[in-house]
Regions:
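Extracytoplasmic/secreted envelope proteins and their assembly/folding machinery
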Residues: 5, 14, 26, 85-92, ...
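Catalytic-core segments of hydrolase enzymes
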Residues: 1-57, 111-120
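Short glycine- and Lys/Arg-enriched binding-loop motifs that mark or flank ligand-binding interfaces
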Residues: 20, 29, 38, 76, ...
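Extracytoplasmic soluble-region selector
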Residues: 170-259
Length: 259
């Protein structure tokens, strides 16, 4: 959209949401500019079905959509900032429900700031070009977009549900590099002084798969609180760090963010 301000999204009291594709690049249709606050998955039809968002479909009488088997409601694949915005609304609602469970409350400005700080940057993906298609009155048009045009124009980055819940719950967040090779991560700091001894790191199968973690051992202590691991996927996951001090086991859940 050439960076044009789109209202009501551009109003200062509104959270303006852009859309990113499954490879963290801008969806070809996304709004962008210094007024965009954050982004969320919006799909990109150029990538095929697997690159879109599985969404609910309402009665065809209002949506103009008819399933081949006669159903009036169901699910289908879509793209759009209309896919990205529900991600943000849902995560925001999830966070408020969790805060209420913990007995916490926020002003509008406080919660807005919390959302904005519960994001991960996609700036490193905003380089090179990508192929795209868009619809016109003349049909489908092939085009190429320069991803660098979107740098610093997609807000704080992509809203991360796990980071939001961690920030609300006071769970430590530790960042690591995702290089595909061994990296050293100071997980011991999550345990204070106890973490300077040998630490054990417990990783669920879900976390291992999500971040592509390998090359670590869950049964041996890592000295000085430094965990060595290989990571192939960016994202975030929950791991548990523990240490045995004087016969007492201390542990702390940590949100591990791979970038």
């Amino acid at each position: 959209d050439k960076g044009a301000r789109i209202y009501p999204a551009a109003y200062s009291k509104v959270i303006a949401v852009g859309a990113m594709a499954s490879d963290y690049t801008p969806s070809y249709f996304t709004d962008y500019g210094d007024w965009v606050d954050l982004v969320a998955p919006g799909g990109d039809a150029y990538y095929g079905t697997e690159g879109q968002i599985l969404s609910t479909v309402l009665d065809p009488g209002t949506a103009g959509f008819v399933f081949s088997d006669g159903r009036k409601t169901g699910y289908d694949w879509f793209q759009g900032t209309s896919m990205a915005c529900p991600h943000v609304s849902g995560i925001a609602a999830l966070g408020l429900a969790y805060a209420d469970k913990l007995g916490k409350s926020y002003t509008v400005d406080q919660y807005r700031s919390l959302l904005m700080s519960s994001t991960y940057s996609i700036e490193s993906y905003l380089k090179g070009t990508k192929d795209a298609q868009y619809s016109t009155n003349m049909g489908i048009v092939d085009t190429t977009i320069d991803c660098s045009d979107y740098r610093r124009k997609l807000g704080a980055g992509c809203l991360d549900a796990l980071l939001l819940l961690a920030n609300i719950g006071g769970i430590p967040v530790i960042t690591m590099e995702c290089t595909g090779d061994y990296v050293k991560v100071d997980l011991g700091k999550a345990l204070g002084g106890a973490g300077k001894r040998g630490i054990y790191v417990t990783v669920s199968q879900e976390a291992q798969t999500r971040l592509g973690l390998s090359g670590y051992n869950q049964t041996i202590p890592y000295q000085n609180g430094i965990w060595e691991v290989k990571c192939t996927n960016t994202g975030s996951a929950l791991v548990t760090v523990s240490a045995n001090i004087g016969g007492t086991t201390v542990s702390q859940d940590v949100v591990l963010v791979a970038r």
